């Protein structure tokens, strides 16, 4: 059975989704979970694009031990140099080089002739091979490229030392039959193509990213690129969890397999969703909450008699737990730590101590603490602190029928100074956000607001997700609390803190550029 390598680009292509801005700690946590999932390659970022991306790629490369870490680079020496400095400490450094090959890109974006594009591609691969044992070369917009030219340039980059050839459907234009035919054409028209790995990278603009990826496997691809939950620019990328499960369920047809630990899929999906703020649609294949629900009476009757009548994927296959351990106010620190580790999270002693305090506070108000509650507390303690920016000290909201809602908020800034403001609004949340905007002394546009319960019951934790725009920066934020307004405030502060973090990084990058 053929082995298919899984190339995860959640941290690079996935993060290009509008409003997703992950900090270093969040990227590291996702990378660790991808390692537990068993992906073969993690594309950690674009090292030359910014100081922040460089540091993230470097730390991920030095942290991850059981899979290869790569970074993206344009076909210029400075990008390749930056990528090597970021990746050289990894277990298996590899580079992902790209240049556009379609007529429209060569003419309008690159403003280069086809001959110049070939020369640039060859020289960049030769230069990269001085550093990297594995060089992946991508033909950007390959699916709108002329096939004879595509075969010609691939022939030359293989001669120059490329070890993986990637065929991206950059704009989500191709159909499965056409995409498969490209791989067949290249296999028949590129000398020595059997000496390299062929890779597929599909976007979902026409809703065919997963189907196209599977078609590529049928026609010789041995590496598939995609993201968790299919997140990515525009309509997103191929959803890796769907491809992996399709290969597992239909191994009789595809005769191919991955090395993914499928039981880690749900946990990985939830982690990415919570950290990015991108909600998982309930009808999402493999990991949506309705994926294993049966509404029809006929279906329910069949499933009760024999699950396989209507259920081709068992919830347990992808790590959906039928039950979870419940902790309470009498649970100790040791039980808490054990459960945190069983859930797949690594916390320092200091983080466990802080989490235990939050856990006890919640246990005094809520009888049973479920796994979902615990994960929400972990996220708040581990990822939601921006020590150099704003933190919520207290809030008070006055609301009554036929009264104007009024909010009073006290924040602490990065220097420990208290800021107190008050404002009114048409509703409690608007009053709260108007007050916070005064505290920030900057104009904030709320683009999206979403609330959900973490678990069931009247005493359930509330989790709020927001998306905001400040100047030209869009970010998302999240907040968790038993009180809806407190969760709303935390989410808003979290999102705006991310804006300030990005502005700080931009300023640092400008200083470096001027030196």
UniProtKB/Swiss-Prot annotation:
Pathway note: Amino-acid biosynthesis; L-leucine biosynthesis; L-leucine from 3-methyl-2-oxobutanoate: step 1/4
Domain Pyruvate carboxyltransferase: 4-266
Keyword check for Metal-binding: yes
Entry's localization field: Cytoplasm
Listed Pfam families: HCS_D2, HMGL-like, LeuA_dimer
InterPro entries, alphabetized: 2-IPM_HCS-like, 2-isopropylmalate_synth_dimer, AIPM/Hcit_synth_CS, Aldolase_TIM, LeuA/HCS_post-cat, LeuA_allosteric_dom_sf, LeuA_bact_synth, PYR_CT
Alphabetical keyword list: Amino-acid biosynthesis, Branched-chain amino acid biosynthesis, Cytoplasm, Leucine biosynthesis, Manganese, Metal-binding, Transferase
Domain of life: Bacteria
Enzyme class: transferase
Family: Belongs to the alpha-IPM synthase/homocitrate synthase family. LeuA type 1 subfamily.
Primary role: Catalyzes the condensation of the acetyl group of acetyl-CoA with 3-methyl-2-oxobutanoate (2-ketoisovalerate) to form 3-carboxy-3-hydroxy-4-methylpentanoate (2-isopropylmalate).
Protein name, per record: 2-isopropylmalate synthase
């Amino acid at each position: 059975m053929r082995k298919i390598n899984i190339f995860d680009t959640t941290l690079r292509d996935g993060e290009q989704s509008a409003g997703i801005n992950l900090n270093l700690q969040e990227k590291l946590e996702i990378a660790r979970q991808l390692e537990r999932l068993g992906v073969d390659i993690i594309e950690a970022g674009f090292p030359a694009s910014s100081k922040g991306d460089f540091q993230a790629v470097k730390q991920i490369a030095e942290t991850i031990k059981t899979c290869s870490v790569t970074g993206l680079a344009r076909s210029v020496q400075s990008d390749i140099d930056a990528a090597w400095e970021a990746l050289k400490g990894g277990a298996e450094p590899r580079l992902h080089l790209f240049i556009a090959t379609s007529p429209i890109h060569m003419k309008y974006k690159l403003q280069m002739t086809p001959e110049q594009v070939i020369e640039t591609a060859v020289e960049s691969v030769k230069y990269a091979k001085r550093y990297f044992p594995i060089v992946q070369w991508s033909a950007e917009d390959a699916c709108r490229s002329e096939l004879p030219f595509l075969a010609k340039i691939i022939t030359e980059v293989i001669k120059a030392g490329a070890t993986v050839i990637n065929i991206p459907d950059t704009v989500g234009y191709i159909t499965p039959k056409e995409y498969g035919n490209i791989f067949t054409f290249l296999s028949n028209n590129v000398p020595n193509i059997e000496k390299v790995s062929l890779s597929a990278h599909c976007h979902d603009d026409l809703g065919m990213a997963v189907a196209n990826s599977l078609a590529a496997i049928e026609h010789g691809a041995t590496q598939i690129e995609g993201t968790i939950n299919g997140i990515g620019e525009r309509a997103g990328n191929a959803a890796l969890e769907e491809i992996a499960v399709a290969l597992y369920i239909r191994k009789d047809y595809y005769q191919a397999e991955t090395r993914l630990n499928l039981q880690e899929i749900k946990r990985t999906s939830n982690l990415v969703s919570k950290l990015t703020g991108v909600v998982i649609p309930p009808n999402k294949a493999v990991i949506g909450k309705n994926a294993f629900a049966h509404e029809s009476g006929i279906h329910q009757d069949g499933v009760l008699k024999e699950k396989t009548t209507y259920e081709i994927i068992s919830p347990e296959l992808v790590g959906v737990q039928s039950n979870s351990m419940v902790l309470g106010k009498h649970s100790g620190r040791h039980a808490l730590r054990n459960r945190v580790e069983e859930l797949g999270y690594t916390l320092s002693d200091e983080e466990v101590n802080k989490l235990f305090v939050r856990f006890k506070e919640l246990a005094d108000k809520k009888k049973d603490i479920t796994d979902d509650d615990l994960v929400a507390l972990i996220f708040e303690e581990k990822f939601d602190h921006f020590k150099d920016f704003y933190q919520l000290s207290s809030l008070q909201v006055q609301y009554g029928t036929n009264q104007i809602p009024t909010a009073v908020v006290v924040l602490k800034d990065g220097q420990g100074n208290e800021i107190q403001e008050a404002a009114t609004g048409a509703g409690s949340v608007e009053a709260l956000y108007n007050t916070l905007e005064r505290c920030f002394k900057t104009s904030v546009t709320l683009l999206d607001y979403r609330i959900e319960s973490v678990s069931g019951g009247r005493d359930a934790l509330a989790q709020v997700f927001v998306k905001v725009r400040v100047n030209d920066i869009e970010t998302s934020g999240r907040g968790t609390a038993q009180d809806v307004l407190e969760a709303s405030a935390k989410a808003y502060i979290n999102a705006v803190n991310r804006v300030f973090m990005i502005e700080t990084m931009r300023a640092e990058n400008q200083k470096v550029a001027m030196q």
